[in-house]
Regions:
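Short linear motifs at secondary-structure transitions and domain/linker junctions
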Residues: 93-97, 105-107, 251-256, 325-328
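Generic detector of short, locally flexible boundary/turn motifs and exposed helical patches
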Residues: 93-95, 239-246, 316-319
């Protein structure tokens, strides 16, 4: 069956697929017939049949971020359903694409919000670790850019390299800006983490400028004033400003890295998370911490479904908490793992030396039983 007029995030992906799969002459014929105009009228996507769109729906996050395709039952199971088929009828830009006649089920992404669950992100110089709470309150790590998640797991898979590879920046940014949330970006345009490292190790020296692995140093170094030149694999040059001088319109690798982390965290397998904890080196100035947190917020929000982003009540509960230092975060985990459980007025004094991939931090403080009923312990840390 042929599809009706189409708008919205999913349809941007359909359009992208159309432009890549039909010949230029055929596309010009479609435009001549009024199948798309410069003033924003929707394109008729009848050159793709419903089976092809079904495949796109199942592979939507594989196309975006190399995440394993969803199983077919997500489209027809009344207790599941697909986010990209859902829209709020009163919302602007609500997609017209309706596949209910195929027996497909739309799912309101609000139903998948993991309330009171948290995500913790250790944004490291060489690698980044991400963990989240599942419905059983178990803490699970996330691996990014390793390809098929069913292949054998190694511990180092969860140390996600802090690196980004630019293949086609223009194509990526065009798609990234096209919709409010879950844009029709392509993984092949920008890689991060394990995939980017694999490519770096096999690349020629002439391709090194397509890789950027100093995200954290770039953000934290107050002495970096000159612009950094990035050249993608299409030989397009981009000047990357000093981090502190970036505006919201500038290319921001930290935001793009966070966007991909957001896709791996928030999807139709894991659900949606609104509470994030981000650790920082002790020595980072408050303004830098705040700007990094803002970059993560923009990137992670971009990975969320549009109905949530348009819901002010829900988004008031979205937060990036960046108040804890990296050594203090380690102290919280280590003290509990080693069985330090102070009671009453008992206090445990600690100090931590954190020899990281690019920085060395020191923190010291006091660990005691919490007086607040919703917490077990309180840590008072002083830094150095």
């Amino acid at each position: 069956e042929k599809l009706p007029l189409c708008e919205g995030s999913l349809c941007e992906m359909v359009r992208a697929k159309v432009s890549r799969t039909i010949q230029e002459k055929e596309l010009e014929e479609l435009k001549a017939k009024g199948a798309g105009t410069e003033d924003g009228e929707p394109i008729v996507v009848d050159e793709l049949d419903a089976d092809e769109v079904s495949r796109l729906l199942l592979e939507v996050d594989h196309e975006r971020a190399d995440i394993d395709p969803y199983d077919e039952k997500i489209l027809t199971d009344p207790n599941r359903g697909h986010w990209d088929l859902w829209c709020d009828s009163e919302a602007d830009g609500c997609p017209v694409l309706d596949l209910s006649y195929q027996g497909y089920v739309a799912r309101n992404p609000r139903a998948d919000i993991n309330r009171n669950r948290i995500v913790a992100i250790d944004f490291g110089t060489k690698s980044t670790v991400v963990v989240y709470q599942n419905e059983d309150s178990r803490i699970l790590p996330v691996r990014v850019g390793t390809g098929n998640v069913s292949k054998s797991i190694r511990a180092e898979h969860y140390e996600n390299p802090t690196i980004i590879e630019f293949n086609d920046i223009e194509s990526f940014l065009e798609a990234y800006a096209a919709t409010l949330g879950r844009p029709a970006t392509r993984w092949d345009d920008v890689y991060i983490s394990h995939r980017a490292v694999d490519d770096l190790q096999s690349s020629l020296s002439t391709d090194y400028s397509a890789f950027f692995s100093e995200l954290k140093q770039w953000a934290g170094d107050a002495g970096v004033k000159k612009a950094i030149r990035i050249r993608d694999r299409q030989d397009n040059d981009y000047l990357l400003k000093a981090f502190r001088e970036l505006t919201d319109e500038d290319l921001n690798p930290i935001e793009l890295y966070a966007y991909y982390l957001g896709l791996y965290i928030n999807n139709m397998r894991n659900g949606i998370f609104l509470n994030y904890y981000l650790s920082f080196p002790v020595t980072y100035e408050f303004a830098v911490r705040e700007k990094i947190a803002e970059s993560f917020e923009r990137g992670i929000k971009k990975a969320l479904p549009e109905p949530l982003l348009r819901d002010e009540e829900i988004m008031r509960n979205f937060r990036i908490n960046g108040s804890i230092s990296e050594p203090a975060a380690y102290a919280v985990c280590a003290l509990q793992e080693y069985g330090f459980e102070p009671e009453g007025n008992e206090e445990v004094f600690y100090s931590v030396f954190d020899f990281g991939g690019g920085t060395t931090d020191f923190d010291f403080g006091v660990w005691r039983e919490s007086r607040a009923p919703k917490y077990d312990y309180t840590i008072e840390h002083f830094g150095a």
